Amino acid sequence: MSIKLTPTWFIKEYSSISIEFLKKQSIKTIFADIDNTLVDWDELDTNDTLQTWVQQLKENHIEIILVSNNRKNRIERVAEQLGVPYVFPGLKPLHKGFKEALSQTTATKDEIVMIGDQLLTDILGAGTFGIKTILVKPLKLSDAKKTRINRFFENLILTILYGKNYSEKWEEKIHD
């Protein structure tokens, strides 16, 4: 079970993931969570850093598909601002959202990575679906009420898997 809860990579934030790294890993498609992964959970709009990163992905023929458990209007708003497709409902960690996202791309599972901030939804779901994963630190220390219980168990699991200093696992940057 721990293998499905073990991310392929730890990275502090999405914007530290370089195009060169993705190409070296033969990644053609990114499935990405929204809240506290790409956008602060309590912010409505995307920011310039995210817009630039997504534009760089597009220029390098790396597609991004949003897979979120949030409300449809939230997902649509972010997807529209970024000009990317999305899946609703995500239903992570179940495979329904991942299957739908896979049907929207020509990439194989080996060419896809899921980027998310939650071990029990993003990483577990993608891991059991058979795709690579990047666990990022949440953009904000606070969470929506519905997420707080997950965070408690995630911290417990990460401590069991990696020890008290598991936060040292996060890389500053993935570049090559």
Question: Where in the sequence are the language-model features?
Answer:
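Active-site residues of response regulator receiver
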Residues: 33
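Asp-based, Mg2+/Mn2+-dependent phosphohydrolase catalytic module
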Residues: 2-30, 43-44, 51-62, 67, ...
